């Protein structure tokens, strides 16, 4: 049986006003409208050129987030953004530039024919990026962003030839909402292969590309990025859980269908994906002590020691 709503009184207790978000993250439209707490929403723009500038900044941040997570593998991997000015075009990373170094000015604009028509100094295009992402964007007008890379746990799980089990609350985001693309024909350099991937994806949010890696899509950059990060972690969790269960001669405990469907409505909506990515982008956009140069850390440490000695005893 699906769990009761977190906003309903339990055991005869009176309903009290929630001062914190009552759902986790509780962002599907129907539930969101019922809440006293107003969740933020993605910004909207009247000027598509201003929207383009903003989204390019977010896309560059997305690459740096991927870099921090170690999702880069040599020159493999790409995230694309449908251009708000000309929606048949998309922005993508230049081939060979490290994820962690990408700025908005480095991004390149690719048209429907696969020609680079604008961008930074490096205008090399990864052919596989065009073949996969052009096909996905063309087949799915609702997709603003698509992300693919050869992350370690994702590509490991993709070698098993199976879909993800629903064994955690987080994996409920992908319950009946991801596919297994059961084919590997080498690097995607042919238009037909890109179309096959897009066809297999259908209306789902994610695909496990067998012997290859993960692909996620979203109505916002943030959504696509969060689904990728979350799917990678779900693959990691299942690899560990399956190994631990097998070592004990047992199996993992699966979440029931009704509970999984209920939870997917809460944690698997586009708005849930967008909002869940907020901490990732907030951290990327602000300096923190973990990113300070070593000499700054040393100066900070010496200052702290001096303050402690001067204020103790």
Segments (PLM) and residue ranges:
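Flexible, glycine/proline-enriched loop segments at strand-loop-helix junctions
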Residues: 49-52, 118-127, 179-188
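Short, conserved beta-strand edge motifs with alternating hydrophobic and charged residues
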Residues: 148-150, 181-182, 207-210, 218
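N-terminal low-complexity or amphipathic/hydrophobic leaders
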Residues: 21-115
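A conserved C-terminal secondary-structure "cap"
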Residues: 2-53, 59, 208, 213-313
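Short HxH-centered metal-ligating active-site micro-motif
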Residues: 111-156, 191-203, 212
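Solvent-exposed alpha-helices and their adjacent loops that cap or buttress functional pockets
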Residues: 71-74, 82-85, 99-102, 137-140, ...
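Class I SAM-dependent methyltransferase SAM-binding "motif I" and its flanking Rossmann-like core
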Residues: 152-189, 193
């Amino acid at each position: 049986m699906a769990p009761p709503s977190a906003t309903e009184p339990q055991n005869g207790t009176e309903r009290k006003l929630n001062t914190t978000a009552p759902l986790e993250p509780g962002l599907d439209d129907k539930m969101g409208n019922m809440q006293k707490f107003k969740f933020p929403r993605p910004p909207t723009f009247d000027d598509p050129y201003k929207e383009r500038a903003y989204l390019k900044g977010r896309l560059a941040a997305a690459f740096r987030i991927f870099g921090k997570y170690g999702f880069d593998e040599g020159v493999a991997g790409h995230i694309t953004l449908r251009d708000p000015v000309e929606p048949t075009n998309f922005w993508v990373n230049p081939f060979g530039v490290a994820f962690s170094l990408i700025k908005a000015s480095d991004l390149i604009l690719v048209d429907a024919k696969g020609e680079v028509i604008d961008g930074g100094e490096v205008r090399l295009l990864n052919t596989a990026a065009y073949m996969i992402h052009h096909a996905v964007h063309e087949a799915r007008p609702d997709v603003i962003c698509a992300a693919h890379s050869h992350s370690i746990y994702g590509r490991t799980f993709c070698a098993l030839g199976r879909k993800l089990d629903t064994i955690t609350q987080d994996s409920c985001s992908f319950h009946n909402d991801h596919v297994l693309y059961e084919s590997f024909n080498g690097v995607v350099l042919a238009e037909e292969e890109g179309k096959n991937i897009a066809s297999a994806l259908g209306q789902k949010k994610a695909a496990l590309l067998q012997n290859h890696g993960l692909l996620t899509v979203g109505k916002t950059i943030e959504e696509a990025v969060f689904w990728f990060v979350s799917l990678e972690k779900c693959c990691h969790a299942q690899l560990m859980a399956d190994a631990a269960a097998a070592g004990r001669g047992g199996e993992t405990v699966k979440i029931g269908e009704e509970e999984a469907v209920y939870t997917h409505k809460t944690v698997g909506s586009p708005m849930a994906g967008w909002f869940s990515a907020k901490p990732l982008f907030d951290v990327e956009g602000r300096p923190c002590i973990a990113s300070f140069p070593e000499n700054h850390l040393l100066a900070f440490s010496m200052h702290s020691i001096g303050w402690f000695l001067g204020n103790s005893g």
